[in-house]
Amino acid sequence: MAFWLPQNIQRRLILYVLQQITLFSNVDITKLDVSLGSHSKFTFQDVDLNISEMNISGCEVNSGMLGKLMLGLTVSGDVHISGDNIDFMITMINEDDFNDMNSFSLAKSFYDLTSSIMQFKPDAHLKNEISGSGSDSPRIPDDYTNPSSAGGNPTTNTYDIIVDDTASSTTESDDSSPIDSIPTSRFNIMQQKVIATALAKLKITLQSVRIRINLGKRKDCNCLDVVVKRIDMSTSEGHVRNFDANGISIAYINNEPSVVPPNNMDMAESLYFSQADASSIYMSALSDANTDIKSLDASVFNSERYELLSINGMSFSFVGISSIDDFAISRIKINLGTLQVNIPFLLKVREDIILTMIFKLISPRHTDKVDVKNSPAYKRFQNELHSNDTNLFSNLAIEEILIGLSSNQKIILRAVDLESNEINGINLSVGDIDLVGLDMDWISETRPCFNASFGKSNTIIELANTIIRVSEHDLILFLKIYYEIMDFIDFVLSKWKILGVKQVSQLRNDEKFSLNVGSLVIEIPLDNSILEINIPNIEHDSLNQDLKLYEVNMTHIVESIKISSLKLKEVSIDLSSARKKMKCYNEHFSQYFVFTHYKVQITGIDSQINLKSLWIIGAVIEQFYIASPVQEYPEATNKNSVRFHDNNKRLLSTSLMINKRAILAKYIIELDDIKVCISGFDADQIRHCKFSLQRLLFLNQIDKGLLFNIFQPHVEIKFFSGSLNDIIRSTNIGVSGQPHLILCIFADKKIKVSIKDIMIFYQAKWLDSVQRNASLDQEKGQNVEYSELPEFSISIRDSAINFLPFRINPSLVILFESIIVTKSGNDALINMHSKVGRFYLTDNYDHLKTTQVMNKTICDSLIKSGYSQIGKFEGLSMTLNKKHKIVNCNGCLEKVILSVCSDSFHTLVQLCMDLKVPVTFPDDKKYQPVPSVAVDLFETIEENEFNLSNLDNKDIDKSIGSDSDSLHIVNSFLDEVEDFQFHEDYNSGTVWSHTTSDTHSSSDILPISLKEEYLDSRRTEVQKHSQSNDRNIISEIDFDIKNADIRLYDGYDWRYTRKNVSSAISELEEGLLSGIQRQEQTESELSRTTVFDSICIATKQKDLGNLKQIISEQVQGKHDHLNSDKVYLYPSKHYKSLIKANELIFKIKIYDSNSPRNEEFNNHAAKLFQITASISTYEVLDNLPTSTWNKFVTLLKKEAWPKSEPMLYFDFMLFKPINSLEATEATINIRSAPLRIHADQYMVDFLLRFFQFNDKRFELIDEYPEILFLQKFKSNTIKLRIDYKPNKTSSGMYSGKISDLINLFVLDESKVTLKGVVLHGINGFNELSEQLVKIWGNDVTSKQIFNILQGFAPVKSFIALGAGAQTFITVLLAEYKRDRSISRSVKKSGNIFIKTTTGDFIKLGAKLAVGTQALLENTEGILSGNATQNRTLADVSQTNKVLDLDSLLQQDQVLIGRNPKIRNKSPSAIIIDAADLEESGRPKVVSLYSEQPLDLHKGLEEAYHALEKHIQIAYNTIWQTNQELRGEESRSAKAAAVTIAKAAPVAVIRPMIGATEAIAKTLQGIYNQLDKSNIEEINDKYKKEDN
């Protein structure tokens, strides 16, 4: 430009040139200073940039200001641009506005930005092509003409020519570049040379650059503030562009709503969001906005600033932009000084930045407009960009990267270097890692510590051997930041997915990625210890697509000693993109397939860990868990989303296809061969505890929750004594490959556990350790607070609980076929239900057999290992609840059946008593014989106070006469007895034999009215009062049993018992043989021996050869297969006695005896627990084959007993009489209903032998033996009605505890009354039994002999008749004395005699008839050899075989048996011979008193059939004899005589038997019609044929 032109013209020319640049189209020439010359300078002040034409995708430029712009030009072509105070304000466009914009691409945004700065006409056309809009061409001054036109005539300007040519060229070919088709002219060539010269010597200096990016259109919206203090750009040889910048920072400004006056609000909004219309090249372009952007900041923003990123120095260089047509860039080099990133601030503002900036800038949008990739500008940009892409990037070097974790905690990465070359690709290295402000060290053995190589076909990442020392606090801080970063990444990916952006493509098959990490050691200092995690090597190869950790070691070090270790073997993480398929089981043990993309497999875990280390590590993990975010699962899923494949779809040819359910999982973790050993228990007995799992499968199901499959779990404890005890063990049962335990944690936090084929052990010895730990915690003042349990459900199938006692060695197994334990809702209610269960018992757990063979059921496994099944139960339900700090347990059992022998019953009782820790104390803790504080009793007594000389007789008389005062004191004392809990028991036990008022005169003594049972009534009131005010109850247990059956078997379950009994028998036989040889013993002398305190074996010399067979028959019954050389002591086939009980109710209250109390209460009593049991009804049945009686014990129905009252009530209470001492006492209260007893001598022998069995192996021996002191025993009056039938009149009871005299009498309805007793101060139960026998025995022998003799069978009827005769005479004399009329007196007394004695006469007649029948049957049996076979019933009560009576009768008729038809009428009763049964056994004899007719009519009918039957039998016998005689005619006469002799007794005696039976049935019918209650008593007493 000519410098001689006027200043105004120079400004106009400069304005014209600047207006070709869109940004400077609004330049005010009044603020332009021009200095022309060899070094020309153009200075602009307060330049308001025209930002209306600046287009940035997703953004709107609101304002642009330059405080000062200086343009320097030299003659040599140097160009120097200097700018100061550069401010831009950009607003992110809202989502709605953004959706209306054109589709985004990097080429379009770059082109829009450059074209908005430089008004190139052809590029404007290209812009229209890209955007698809026909925007108008840039504004050209109206008075502008082409300077080259001649004559000043207006001609077509150069731009128009270019546009036309371009348009025509673009229509010729789509593949040709529009730039190449533009015709060049000399002016264009000159223009390009000038620009190239300027670009070659271009220098740019910018200071105080500020870009504010508003994240919304609201006035108080948040924003990003980008500040650069200084930017210097220079050009060196070879078109190398060098940029130097410092003071770079990016901050987030959180704006609060500002208070702007209403008058300025509109102005502020206009300045904030828009600018004035564009100025023309005339004077209108000189208009001023009159508002400064800085004043805008001060008035609008009241902000809080967060520094996100800062760079103190940056050097950037590249080669390129050599001309306006060459924008190619290559050899980029970047050097950074210190790069500081504040992670907490970034995470805090992540949502604003991501939502409003990142995705609005780079998110793709679908549009129907022209595809930008096909535009010529995009093609030219791609050609320039990729013309030399191998040399595009050269080097990135960063001195330090400061990653701020908090205000004073930073991670420093030093010497970060990123290089790129054609041969090796891209190499990244980190020299060192330092941690500032953290209790953490990063130590690397080599430099650099991190290397990464990114080649064309191979990527390698290496980390040197590293040791990381980090504190627990800092590690938690890192975890929190890590979780926030991962949350941030998930957030970005979720938004990325919503916007439809495709994911990064996977590696190609020819690409290889490998990761190699050397030894990695992480040390976490804890309190006086170090937790060390050592990973020797980490490798990853993209070919194998898995990440391998060959070994992971975790060690807990205390004082340089390794006390715990954990080793993970061969950890493999499958990272392949292929979906993995595995077989899994759900909570119902149903098999299905699971698919996932991520799978982790660990081949083994081996751990030796100390319990203290476990607590420490558990505390650390708990802190990590608290620091980790809670994983939330979606509450509901879309109906269209498919979580698994339904297995209910119909498939063709399903017989050839198995359709299994399938689900999706986020990841799967599979662990094999897990072994964990825990040691260091506080308990003195436990050495260590071992856990082992054969396999563990863990998976995280999508939208469902966590699932664990556990295979072959085994937990055991080893004691210092050497014994090894199991806790949990899988049985050798079930389908191979199925898990034994399944744990499900659902999305709604519910837990479900399924258990199958598992045995859980209860060891009473463990309670000792638990109680010791609890007592230690209590001494330390540590109160354990248990958190509320979540909702859960536990399902148990074919699993068992094994109960092992404390001191003895038997084992009780309760097998549950199905049990469900649930807790629902927020309440503390836990429910348990079980349908069927079984009981198994063994006498020696250590001697069980180990079976390796797979059994079909767990029952088979238990039986083969040595257990005996002793019972089962049905319908178990329990509820557990906690209210007001009291644990309430309610249980109900529908039915329970126990089948036990004497030895197994004794074992079961002893085992149940030993399922707790024995609580015994030495005497110094139970009693306090010496007071803790010495008391001087004579300290307050005057020595001469009670001398006779000092006593006044008047005072004595006066004091003696004041009886009322002393009486009031005593009464007040007695009234206060109610306030004490147990003192009434002591007071009631005191008996006063005399009083101290003997000196009173007889006139002063008032009559005393005695009230019986006054103290008992007072005690009842006190007990009710104490029960209503029970305190310190910690648990209440209520358990009901609807029906209970206890079957008592003869024989023995344990091999040990059978062996000892067999040895005793052998020793007895050997002793008899030796005595016979020495002739020291006669044949009639009885030899005996006793085993287990109850089994008495006695024999004589004549029975020596049959001793074993006799004992076997007593136990098993008569069997043909019994061998006399061997004794059979196994449990009998059928039970010998049955105890039936209904409605058993148990109530247990447990009190807190350890709760802190004041010293004033230490001398008071304290309850420990109270047990209340009641049985509504119970019976004892007699099932001996030789006994004809039915019920051994039943309710005496003739005595009045309320139906609402239980037959048996038992109350037991244990307490401490003095709370500060450990001595315990008990009270017992028993109440029983009147009982009816039918005692057969064999039955009595069996019950005594059964319940007196005592095995010394199961004696419970305590460290400090203690006999329970019974403070009080109370029972009510019990009325008994006894029938007794002896079977052996001379041998007596082998135990010797009952006199032989009782076996001489048969008792029938003997009345015995056991009077109610109240005993105090009893030492143990042995003394209690002795006292009861003494009290009741003396009372019975002294006062009730006559009642017993009334039941003596031979004279009972005569006694009854004598009593009737006595009544007759008494009434006769009384009536005669009153009326003096002999006839009337005889008539009245006769009527009374008949009423009272008729029943006895009939009963006596029936007994005589029955006795005659029995005598005739015995006679027939002796003569014919078939004793009572016609009224015997085989022992089939317990056989499972059902007899077909029709076929039996048909066969019997063909064979002319014992049940003949008479006049084509079936017999009323069926006679079954024991010999005809397949299962032979001792026949069960049916009494002639059973099956009595109900009335006279029924009696006559049965009498007729009985007479008819026996006559028919006699006829059949005679007919059979006649047939035999005809067949034996050819034989001798002797044979015929023998045949007639055998048949004669039957033919003669059988009609007589029929006659006596008919008379008995008739009389029984008459008596039963008179006394209706007799039938019920007969049914209770005698067995029926259908029993």
Swiss-Prot record:
GO terms for cellular component: endoplasmic reticulum membrane; extrinsic component of phagophore assembly site membrane; phagophore; protein-containing complex. It catalyses: a 1,2-diacyl-sn-glycero-3-phosphocholine(in) = a 1,2-diacyl-sn-glycero-3-phosphocholine(out); a 1,2-diacyl-sn-glycero-3-phospho-L-serine(in) = a 1,2-diacyl-sn-glycero-3-phospho-L-serine(out); a 1,2-diacyl-sn-glycero-3-phosphoethanolamine(in) = a 1,2-diacyl-sn-glycero-3-phosphoethanolamine(out). Keywords: Autophagy, Endoplasmic reticulum, Lipid transport, Membrane, Protein transport, Transport. It is a peripheral membrane protein. It is found in: Preautophagosomal structure membrane; Endoplasmic reticulum membrane. GO terms for biological process: autophagosome assembly; autophagy of mitochondrion; cytoplasm to vacuole targeting by the Cvt pathway; glycophagy; pexophagy; piecemeal microautophagy of the nucleus; reticulophagy. Signal peptide: none annotated. Residues 128-160 are annotated as: Disordered. GO terms for molecular function: lipid transfer activity; phosphatidylinositol-3-phosphate binding; protein-membrane adaptor activity. Pfam families: ATG2_CAD. Residues 145-159 have a biased composition (Polar residues). Its main location: membrane. It comes from the Eukaryota. Lipid transfer protein required for autophagosome completion and peroxisome degradation. Tethers the edge of the isolation membrane (IM) to the endoplasmic reticulum (ER) and mediates direct lipid transfer from ER to IM for IM expansion. ATG2 binds to the ER exit site (ERES), which is the membrane source for autophagosome formation, using basic residues in its N-terminal region (NR) and to the expanding edge of the IM through its C-terminal region. The latter binding is assisted by an ATG18-PtdIns3P interaction. Belongs to the ATG2 family. This is Autophagy-related protein 2. It comes from Candida glabrata (strain ATCC 2001 / BCRC 20586 / JCM 3761 / NBRC 0622 / NRRL Y-65 / CBS 138). The lineage of its organism: Eukaryota, Fungi, Dikarya, Ascomycota, Saccharomycotina. The gene is ATG2.
